[in-house]
Swiss-Prot record:
The record marks R463 as: Lowers pKa of C-terminal Cys of second active site. This is Protein disulfide-isomerase. The active site is at C55 (nucleophile), C58 (nucleophile), C399 (nucleophile), C402 (nucleophile). One of its GO terms (biological process) is response to endoplasmic reticulum stress. It catalyses: Catalyzes the rearrangement of -S-S- bonds in proteins. CDD domains: PDI_a_family, PDI_a_PDI_a'_C, PDI_b'_family, PDI_b_family. Residues 480-502 have a biased composition (Acidic residues). The lineage of its organism: Eukaryota, Metazoa, Chordata, Craniata, Vertebrata.
Length: 510
């Protein structure tokens, strides 16, 4: 600690001694290996983004990150924001376990042994609120109306506990809830003027927000669990737009059933269609999260593909559950009235809607090449043929590993094209789905031996022609592995830092 204090004094008193003082870009410190340690010593609290110049997520984060840095600097905060180009500073990236972009870590008191991973949203308010929670009290004491008003205005969502006795059991429960939430500012007050300002004549908790009804008053027994449920239920808008910034809130939230309206902002009656969607949302608050996506936006095209949609098919509605297995649902009607959307959601909650499985049309020449082409419509017939041993690659067109495997898979097809009972096949899993098979990574290789038992064997051996041949000649034994082994192998091999933006977007967002 003494060494750190002396170094801070030296930096402050004699900038010339700081041989490689970091530059600033929009209030964000630009760090390199040569000045990283000194920056940690000079700043008690330092949030560092490890980024890549080509990363789409990093580009989207940049203005919000700079906005947060400027806000904290203007407040005279001890917290500073910094960034490291991990493609240039590979030693730093390796030291701090950077495997994907952006990776954001929080350093306190120069501690490099265990920096905290940043886990909140990607809007400026989220960043500022998370940092203040990490460096200050769980709830700010509000001595007067001006302080309360300042807190409410500081963020899209804020929570204030009104307690005449701030040492009461209810107040303690409130503070425990405040400690559990990183991305929302909390305040606590016992001041009678603040009670009057917000029309309270007894103890209570109020969530203030700059959308929808503006505020929600907590009702019920004040416990940590009840307060957390209340906040999670009310903190998001009835309808939220999907963007790079809102994605962490959407996918990291407690509500795992999402209904999506793919709505181009250029469409006629845009406001009317969005209004219908919002009207339907009122009946499902806390049960289904209503999200709308600008289907014309370039960044959202991969999501359309994931749902098997084309731009010209929008506006459209789809529903997805984000439990252990993602399952999609499609309304029977294309009408986007509030009544139709409400009916669809009710039927889903009642278990009356079957999952929607995508399938491309079957190509006329699907079986004319050594590697047979499977789609959703012919998968069952081919893969589970009782008289055939079928080896299938489940791939994604954008997957780098799949592209590397393609020529080997084609050679495998050539090897067995005239075999009486071995079939080599492939299926684009971004455009085709089958109920019996869940694909978690690309490429996934599965073997369907000739059998009446619908047996499925995962391949986890070498991705070489010889490895595949040994596997097939052994009847699916040499190289077999369970699905968990396959996922671990993919994760171990996956060069996260070299993924193209689209691939990472699908993984992160879906």
């Amino acid at each position: 600690m003494l060494r750190r204090a002396l170094l801070c004094l030296a930096v402050a008193a004699a900038p010339g001694l700081y041989a490689d003082a970091p530059e600033e870009e929009d209030h964000v410190l630009v760090l390199r290996k040569s000045n990283f340690a000194e920056a940690l010593a000079a700043h008690k609290y330092l949030l560092v983004e490890f980024y890549a110049p080509w990363c789409g997520h990093c580009k989207a984060l940049a203005p919000e990150y700079a906005k947060a840095a400027g806000k904290l600097k203007a407040e005279g905060s001890e917290i500073r924001l910094a960034k490291v180009d991990a493609t240039e500073e590979s030693d730093l990236a390796q030291q701090y376990g950077v495997r994907g972009y952006p990776t954001i870590k929080f350093f306190r008191n120069g501690d490099t042994a265990s920096p905290k991973e940043y886990t909140a949203g990607r809007e400026a308010d989220d960043i500022v609120n998370w940092l203040k929670k990490r460096t200050g009290p769980a709830a700010t004491t509000l001595p007067d109306g001006a302080a309360a008003e300042s807190l409410v205005e500081s963020s899209e969502v804020a929570v204030i506990g009104f307690f005449k006795d701030v040492e009461s059991d209810s107040a303690k429960q409130f503070l425990q809830a405040a400690e559990a939430i990183d991305d929302i500012p909390f305040g606590i007050t016992s001041n009678s003027d603040v009670f009057s300002k917000y029309q309270l004549d007894k103890d209570g908790v109020v969530l203030f927000k700059k959308f929808d009804e503006g505020r929600n008053n907590f009702e019920g027994e004040v416990t940590k669990e009840n307060l957390l449920d209340f906040i999670k239920y009310n903190q998001l808008p009835l309808v939220i737009e999907f963007t790079e910034q809102t994605a962490p809130k959407i996918f990291g939230g407690e509500i795992k059933t999402h209904i999506l309206l793919f709505l181009p902002k250029s469409v006629s009656d845009y406001d009317g269609k969005l209004s219908n969607f919002k009207t339907a949302a009122e009946s499902f608050k806390g049960k289904i999260l209503f999200i709308f996506i600008d289907s014309d936006h370039t960044d959202n095209q991969r999501i359309l593909e994931f749902f098997g949609l084309k731009k010209e098919e929008c506006p459209a509605v789809r529903l997805i559950t984000l439990e252990e297995e993602m399952t999609k649902y499609k309304p029977e009607s294309d009408e986007l009235t509030a009544e139709r959307i409400t009916e669809f959601c009710h039927r889903f909650l009642e278990g009356k809607i079957k999952p929607h499985l995508m399938s491309q049309e079957l190509p006329e020449d699907w079986d004319k090449q050594p590697v047979k082409v499977l789609v959703g419509k012919n998968f069952e017939e081919v893969a589970f043929d009782e008289n055939k041993n079928v080896f299938v690659e489940f791939y994604a067109p954008w997957c780098g590993h799949c592209k590397q495997l393609a020529p080997i898979w084609d050679k495998l097809g050539e090897t067995y094209k005239d075999h009486e009972n071995i079939v080599i096949a492939k299926m684009d899993s971004t455009a085709n789905e089958v109920e019996a098979i869940k694909v978690h990574s690309f490429p996934t290789l599965k073997f369907f031996p000739a059998s009446v038992d619908r047996t499925v064997i995962d391949y986890n051996g070498e991705r070489t022609l010889d490895g595949f041949k040994k596997f097939l000649e052994s009847g699916g034994q040499d190289g077999a592995g369970d699905d968990d082994d396959l996922e671990d192998l993919e994760e171990a091999e996956e060069p996260d830092m070299e993924e193209d933006d689209d691939q990472k977007a699908v993984k992160d967002e879906l």
